[in-house]
Amino acid sequence: MPARRARTGKGAGRTREEVSAGGIVVRRNSGTDVFLVIRDSYSNWGFPKGHLEKGETAEAAALREVAEETGLSDLRMHGAVDTIDWYFRFRGRLVHKVCHFFLIETDLEATSPQREEGITACRWETFEEASALISYDNARAVLRRAAEMMQAGQSGG
């Protein structure tokens, strides 16, 4: 296979770095933890997340994005779950995205998907159901870690 020629010109060879934060939202339902999953406009299932605003901490961004994308309030931060990263191309440019996920708890059930941002559905699911729905392996691993954190918190308290 012939070697590809290097791109030249403005922005060639540069990777755009993006930092996001999101929430693994959990709610207690009759003694069982249920997790919030959202569906985007591409029909992919995952978690609420988005870019950090200027001067905003990752924790604050995670809480803001969860509230904006799902309509939930009464959100309680439980701490960092994991940081994942991935690469993708957008308009011909390579993007390296880093996303910090936090465990967030709520007592509220009713959600309101933010359709203007491409959120087409919100669902509360058990770990097993959420894990089966989630579209990406790295997000599934974050869910597993969040579930482990909830179990550790229950057994310790």
Predicted regions and their residues:
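A periodicity- and composition-biased signal for non-globular, repetitive helical segments
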Residues: 10, 55, 103, 146, ...
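A generic structural signal for ordered secondary structure
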Residues: 34-36, 80, 147-151
